[in-house]
From Swiss-Prot:
Main location: secreted
Lineage of origin: Eukaryota, Metazoa, Chordata, Craniata, Vertebrata
Gene for this chain: IFNW1
Pfam family, one: Interferon
Origin species: Homo sapiens (Human)
GO annotation, biological process: adaptive immune response; B cell activation involved in immune response; cellular response to virus; defense response to virus; humoral immune response; natural killer cell activation involved in immune response; regulation of cell cycle; response to exogenous dsRNA
Descriptive protein name: Interferon omega-1
């Protein structure tokens, strides 16, 4: 529990920068939507993670996708888009509706939908600039496998409260890692712009 608050604070701080610096003309409110997503996921906690220690699972988030040193805009946008699409899909089921507070869940759906629309616009622009289509398709397949593992886990655990709590924490962790990737690309773009 003590580790959760610094993680949330780091997520909020790293998502403060405007996404426009990624080379896309995304609306300024994209950073606000990202922060809201993380805050909503934090607020959705229904039970203490300590009650669910026996249910923990290593979902093997594909960290190689977010930790590379040669980041391309198309890759970053593809990873972010696919992650948000998969999170939206995961939390937009009948089973998730039964597990979570409907007001918070509706707010999460709305925020994710808005972020997806913004990222789709950005992806079209980046691909139009000639970045590799391979930089887009490879992360999508890898992330689909990762999220399929999460879905299988939920089914195995019969969509229990603890299973959903473990998944909620995993989603927050994966968003944190992708936010770090986004920040590294922003820094790289700033460094290139000042050279």
């Amino acid at each position: 529990m003590a580790l959760l608050f610094p993680l949330l604070a780091a997520l909020v701080m790293t998502s403060y920068s405007p996404v426009g610096s990624l080379g896309c003309d995304l609306p300024q409110n994209h950073g606000l939507l990202s922060r809201n997503t993380l805050v909503l996921l934090h607020q959705m906690r229904r039970i203490s993670p300590f009650l669910c220690l026996k249910d923990r699972r290593d979902f093997r988030f594909p960290q190689e996708m977010v930790k590379g040193s040669q980041l391309q805009k198309a890759h970053v946008m593809s990873v972010l888009h696919e992650m948000l699409q998969q999170i939206f899909s995961l939390f937009h089921t009948e089973r998730s509706s039964a597990a979570w507070n409907m007001t918070l869940l509706d707010q999460l759906h709305t925020g994710l939908h808005q972020q997806l629309q913004h990222l789709e616009t950005c992806l079209l622009q980046v691909v139009g600039e000639g970045e590799s289509a391979g930089a887009i398709s490879s992360p999508a397949l890898t992330l689909r496998r990762y999220f399929q593992g999460i879905r299988v886990y939920l089914k195995e655990k019969k969509y229990s409260d603890c299973a959903w709590e473990v998944v909620r924490m995993e989603i927050m962790k994966s968003l944190f890692l992708s936010t770090n990737m986004q920040e590294r690309l922003r820094s790289k773009d700033r460094d290139l712009g000042s050279s």
